[in-house]
Amino acid sequence: MYSMLDTDMKSPVQQSNALSGGPGTPGGKGNTSTPDQDRVKRPMNAFMVWSRGQRRKMAQENPKMHNSEISKRLGADWKLLSDSEKRPFIDEAKRLRAVHMKDYPDYKYRPRRKTKTLLKKDKYSLPGNLLAPGINPVSGGVGQRIDTYPHMNGWTNGAYSLMQEQLGYGQHPAMNSSQMQQIQHRYDMGGLQYSPMMSSAQTYMNAAASTYSMSPAYNQQSSTVMSLASMGSVVKSEPSSPPPAITSHTQRACLGDLRDMISMYLPPGGDAGDHSSLQNSRLHSVHQHYQSAGGPGVNGTVPLTHI
């Protein structure tokens, strides 16, 4: 065992002396023309000194074993050795390092760096050249990500994508004014179709506002208009036309009802002769109000002559 260890220790020393050009060799350090000395190798460490003979022996025993598998097994065997067994190889590695520093004082370790430009180019390319030759792969990937999640951008009915497409068309230099007008008419916000629930709710709010603004005598007409509008909004909501103008007869009737209601709650004014006529007008207005607002059940139940 010790004889094999001595031969393993002597062989790297002789090789290092041959490479560095020892003091007895005529080649010396000045011989730099050979291709072996163009690149200076690092000095061997303790594991490399020990694994030289072990690697050769294991390769002879297992000729089909790969070099990486041999290195794994040698590393596991090196860890199992004790410090006393590693000591001679550590001392030999220190001696080789001292000789290397003496022969090459200006030596600096420069590891070989792999170029990563090809990896960056292949990172953004699709398999099979699916993209067109004039399309940037990075911009195409960003557009695909935006189109993949249209429901998370907060825009309903695809309005965000429509706006982006309209902006893209607007920036095109070869587009004339007629095409731009067609695009603007196509993406007009007034022509967008809303859902039936939204349109019916909007019609209900508009009808409620018109109900409060009109007199109670015309509630039936407004409810009919509201129902017809809600039925029409289920099919398609069109731009609503302005409401018809109130005629003079309707305005006069509303003003008359308003005067009757005000005069009923105000104290009687003027002389005593006007009191009876004012009271009769009050009774007539109250009777007419209940007759128009109530149903047929209210008209014949409570007589108003006892007031």
Swiss-Prot record:
Residues 1-43 are annotated as: Disordered. Gene3D superfamilies: High mobility group box domain (1.10.30.10). One of its GO terms (cellular component) is cytoplasm. This is Transcription factor Sox-3-B. SUPFAM superfamilies: HMG-box. Residues 21-30 have a biased composition (Gly residues). Pfam families: HMG_box, SOXp. Interacts with ctnnb1. Keywords: Cytoplasm, Developmental protein, DNA-binding, Gastrulation, Nucleus, Repressor, Transcription, Transcription regulation. Transcription factor with sequence-specific DNA binding activity. Binds to the consensus sequence 5'-[AT][AT]CAA[AT]G-3', showing a preference for 5'-AACAAT-3' and 5'-AACAAAG-3'. Inhibits beta-catenin-mediated dorsal axis specification by binding to sites within the promoter of the beta-catenin-regulated gene nodal5. Acts maternally as a transcriptional repressor of nodal5 and nodal6 to restrict their expression to the vegetal hemisphere of early embryos and thus establish germ layer formation. GO terms for biological process: brain development; formation of primary germ layer; negative regulation of DNA-templated transcription; negative regulation of transcription by RNA polymerase II; neuron differentiation; positive regulation of transcription by RNA polymerase II. Its main location: nucleus. A motif (9aaTAD) lies at residues 257-268. The 9aaTAD motif is a transactivation domain present in a large number of yeast and animal transcription factors. Residues 40-108 bind DNA. Signal peptide: none annotated.
